[in-house]
From Swiss-Prot:
Transit peptide per record: 1-35
Catalytic activity: N(6)-malonyl-L-lysyl-[protein] + NAD(+) + H2O = 2''-O-malonyl-ADP-D-ribose + nicotinamide + L-lysyl-[protein]; N(6)-succinyl-L-lysyl-[protein] + NAD(+) + H2O = 2''-O-succinyl-ADP-D-ribose + nicotinamide + L-lysyl-[protein]; N(6)-glutaryl-L-lysyl-[protein] + NAD(+) + H2O = 2''-O-glutaryl-ADP-D-ribose + nicotinamide + L-lysyl-[protein]
Chain positions recorded as substrate binding sites: Y101, R104
Note on domains (UniProt): In contrast to class I sirtuins, class III sirtuins have only weak deacetylase activity. Difference in substrate specificity is probably due to a larger hydrophobic pocket with 2 residues (Tyr-101 and Arg-104) that bind to malonylated and succinylated substrates and define the specificity.
Pfam families: SIR2 (PF02146)
EC number: 2.3.1.-
Keyword Transit peptide: yes
Entry-linked Gene3D superfamilies: SIR2/SIRT2 'Small Domain, TPP-binding domain
Protein name: NAD-dependent protein deacylase sirtuin-5, mitochondrial
CDD domains the UniProt entry points to: SIRT5_Af1_CobB (cd01412)
Species in which this protein is naturally found: Gallus gallus
Length: 309
């Protein structure tokens, strides 16, 4: 990639680095033929790929029973996620926001990777032995890819199971259940339940020596910018890939919405696996409709040309 293209991409990352919805009609500036749903053709492309980038969204975890808090009915109590997942909401009512995230953490502790997560992890393990690479770039914060065994994982929106201190900035993995005594039994989503109104000093606190600052979930909230180091890694992997899969994502949240179209624009095959078409579908070479746990395993299974080590 030339220096001008690199500079342009970095500029896009700066402009669109904040988590926000994409326009209703993305202004893509390139045209392609209608995507194919021919699995045999995809498998031939897959067999030749050396560096595969897999971009995943909420749809890949839906079959694990993970609540998405998107669309109609996507409420926790009286609020939608967009009302709670903001710096302002946390500043105004950290107890309410922590109840919401505590509920999500507790739910996720009982969930397991589905066939799509496992297919990705097994593909990565198998291809690594052949000198080929797979990287997963996920918008999900549920860590199901990690549970499935994925090693090369970029979590662009953070993780439910990491905390960040609002005082010292320390980031720590945290799988405690409950995350603090005051949140035990709290966070039920019933709209009739009142907020627990937990005092700040009883909410999760930093355990670094002498700090005791208030912890927050280490996730990217609406209006916040993505970690520039993570974006740099994403950029590097997308520049390197010779095949890109977009799995279970609606392609309507920036900056992830532009990742695969940018890859497609430089001539790299992109395959979309989703329950329905998205605003970006026509920019890709392949589109496979249906549950990811059904469509993805045969797509990533061992090809007859692969040599078993």
């Amino acid at each position: 990639m030339c220096l001008a293209q690199c500079a342009a991409r970095r500029l896009l990352a700066q402009v669109h680095g904040a988590l926000k919805p994409a326009p209703k009609k993305p202004n893509w500036c390139w045209e392609m033929a209608r995507p194919s749903s021919n699995m045999a053709d995809f498998r031939e492309v897959f067999a030749k790929a050396k560096h595969i980038a897999i971009i995943t969204g909420a749809g890949v975890s839906a079959e694990s029973g993970v609540p998405t808090f998107r669309g109609a009915g996507g409420f926790w109590r009286k609020w939608q996620a967009q009302e709670l997942a903001t710096p302002g909401a946390f500043a105004r009512n950290p107890s309410r926001v922590w109840e919401f995230y505590h509920y999500r953490r507790e739910v996720m502790l009982s969930k397991h990777p589905n066939a799509a997560h496992i297919a990705i992890a097994e593909c990565e393990k198998r291809l690594r032995k052949q000198g080929r690479s797979v990287v997963v770039i996920t918008q999900n914060i549920d860590e199901l890819h990690r549970k499935a065994g994925t090693k090369h994982l970029l979590e662009i929106h953070g993780s439910l199971f990491k905390t960040r201190c609002t005082n010292c900035g320390n980031v720590t993995a945290n799988y405690k259940s409950p995350i603090c005594p005051a949140l035990a039994g709290k966070g039920a989503p019933d709209p009739e339940i009142e907020d627990a109104a937990i005092p700040v000093e009883e909410l999760p606190q930093c355990e670094e020596d002498g700090c005791h600052g208030l912890l927050r979930p280490h996730v990217v909230w609406f209006g916040e910018t993505l970690d520039p180091d993570v974006l740099t890694e994403v950029e590097k992997e997308l520049d390197l890939c010779d095949l890109c899969l977009v799995v279970g994502t609606s392609s309507v949240v920036y900056p992830a919405a532009m990742f695969a179209p940018q890859v497609s624009a430089r001539g790299v095959p992109v395959a979309e696996f989703n329950m329905e078409a998205t605003p970006a579908t026509d920019r890709f070479r392949f589109h496979f409709e249906g549950p990811c746990g059904t469509t993805l395993p045969p797509a990533l299974a061992r090809h007859e040309s692969e040599i078993i080590a």
